[in-house]
Regions:
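Short acidic/glycine-enriched loop/turn segments that link adjacent beta-strands
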Residues: 77-79, 121, 192
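Acyl-donor-binding surface of acyltransferase catalytic domains
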Residues: 87-153
Length: 211
């Protein structure tokens, strides 16, 4: 059974929720198994849901026991629906089935985007059987900056701002077909992003961008 989770309920089971978030086979994206995010960061993100009008924390119960938590958020302007937490201890297919039915009923006309690590095979396989298409397949890499050796400045790497954004757009537009963060949305929120572009012989070859 899927139902709204109160802040009191979440606080009572916060340790269990973090335990699930720390297991790559029982959680969705974004991952808390990367060695960077901490329990404090997890709790801070989860608690924000109870103060935001466009977020909900759902509680999943099965067999009379709490088995998971789903933090969902939506962007009405873009008709965009996704999750910041999808945590299930057991019965992942039941949880997904109930969540998809809930989303279909409450968010008609929205596009739903879900992310799961490949290790969560039960979730990935279930969504494939439901007709979901994988539109993005990424590696989750961790850079330990204190271990990096400085390298010489590369004049072919440029920082992107509004004045030279079209140089980055030439590259990004080749891959953005199904992305939420397409070139137009990135430009609109450019002050929140850091973008670095590598060029060779005047042609864009690759980019790093983060927020």
């Amino acid at each position: 059974m899927l139902r709204l989770c109160s802040k009191t309920e979440f606080e009572r089971h916060a340790d269990f929720a973090y335990e699930l978030a720390s297991d790559v086979t029982k959680s969705g994206y974004p991952t808390y198994c990367d060695g960077i995010k901490t329990k404090d960061m997890f709790l801070e993100r989860a608690r924000k849901a109870f103060a935001c009008e466009e977020e909900q924390m759902l509680l999943f119960e099965s067999g009379g026991r709490i088995q998971g938590f789903i933090l969902m958020y939506w962007l009405p302007k873009d008709r965009y629906l996704s999750t910041s937490l999808f945590l299930t201890n057991t019965e992942i297919e039941e949880a997904l089935s109930e969540f998809l039915a809930y989303a279909k009923d409450k968010f008609k006309g929205y596009d739903l985007f879900l992310g799961f690590p490949a290790e969560n095979q039960l979730a990935v396989n279930y969504l494939e059987r439901q007709g979901f298409a994988c539109i993005e397949d990424d590696y989750n890499n961790t850079a330990y900056l204190e271990q990096l050796a400085p390298v010489a400045d590369n004049k072919e790497v440029v920082k992107i701002g509004k004045e030279n954004y079209t140089r980055f757009q030439l590259l990004h537009s080749q891959f953005e077909e199904n992305m939420y963060w397409n070139s137009a949305r990135l430009y609109e929120k450019l002050e929140n992003w850091s973008i670095f572009l590598e060029e060779k012989d005047g042609e864009p070859r690759g980019a790093v961008y983060y927020t």
